[in-house]
Amino acid sequence: MSSNCGCASCGQPPRWQRESHPDFDTVFSMLRQDGLLETDRDHPIIGVCNTWNEIVPGHLHLRDLAEQVKLGIRSSGGVGLEYGCVAPCDGFGNANAGYRYILPMRDNIADSVELMAEAHHFDGMVLLSSCDKSNPGVMMGMARVNRPSIFVGGGIGHNMCPSEILGTAMSMQCLAEALGISLPRTATTYATSPGHRHLALQAGQQVMELVKRGIVPSDILTREAFENAIRVNMAIGGSYNTFIHLPAIAYNAGVEITAEDFDRLSDSTPYLCHIGPNGPCRLGQLDQVGGIPAVMKVLAPLLHLDVMTVTGRTLRENLEQVEIAWDQRPHPNVLRPLDNPCQPTGGLTLLKGNLAPQGAVIRSGGVLPNMLRFEGPAHVFDSEYDAMTAVARSAYRAGEVLLIRNEGIVGGPGMPEQSCVGWTLDRQGMYDKVYLVTDGRYSGACHGPLIGLVTPEAVKGGPIAVVQTGDVIRIDVTSKRIDVLLPDEEIQRRLSAWHPPEPRVRRGFLSRYARQVVPALQGGYLP
């Protein structure tokens, strides 16, 4: 932890500004034009990164929360300066080329956080976000900049299904709490409630305490913290996309997290919360029991309890104050005891086999029992468009494994979600009759017999590139296997004759992204 806090009580300018600007008078003269007072000269400057815009419905209330954050900062002796950041809405990209841009924007957001913080010498940061890519994006930036920081998630929308379930947005807000970078109960409090506004106010006050004590993200985002977050993720059955986002945040924090870590921790972490889309329960119901702190209290025997959090206390100290309201459970599967879980292992499963030598992911907590083992002929599509066209016309058969390739992080490029294909199968009543497999990914709002993130992807020469319609694919979720029933020699023969397809995009951001991005199960980030 840093010893030179730069707070007003030190009687000197904030440390970042003083170290970077011998001519601080010039800098402060510009801040005076922003409306600061002369008495603010010795106060820490806190950057308030707000991903508000009029496009993303989950971000509409962030302006109000930012005002609460700045009020908290000011009441604790600091100055909060708000700035904007790009933030996409995944829904606008569904089943069209716009989805190629959604995941890459996560890294653009992380870069924006870094660029603004370093260019303007903030003493600390509060980062407000609500949605799928902006949440991990600002967390990546927070980890990279490594100044006293707090993440404020937007919370859940009352009676709004996309918000009350463990889609990617809410999964990442829950995992921010599990990592220790968000105040307890922020994720599961209703977005526009007085309680959520109060949590935003507290975040503004607490970031000043972090500045005073010199507590930075690297004190919090340790390997032990990431292992805690993975266990919470398995216990709640979070989004597929957490396999991409947690390793990316870890990379920016200087910690290596792999798909094998998810696999190892899933084996010893029970699935405790049957929350949508996997099950009938909702996040607001989990909040009645105690939210993510209650989940972590149940998991306490499996967690690293001495990790630091943004409360300024360890996880152990935080959990000592948590009471689980078991009698308030509206449904027994909202949260189950450790010795009586929904299932004995985690709600996400890493599959491997000759079809996915480096791995693939299924949300096992949302798979029907009769689909845990499945074998059928492949029906191969070389793009999402081809698959969507066929599925919309019901041009497939029960018992098939529908396989979509060339939609990976390089091939897409940008790894667009294949969610509309999955949702169409669900509406057609086929979730107990077919499997969908892809080197692309899915929305966190998806569940069922959907396998994604097949790695290596097709355009990088993974075996998925040479599967032919009619080849038999065997899936065994219990044994964590996915295989095409072909001799190794035949797979190698096909691969030796295979040539990668021409890039779909040759200029602009996506072209640069495809050339530089690391594989999805390593985090899909720009190094």
Question: Where in this protein do the model-derived segments appear?
Answer:
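A short, small-residue-rich loop immediately preceding and capping a beta-strand
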Residues: 117-138, 150-154
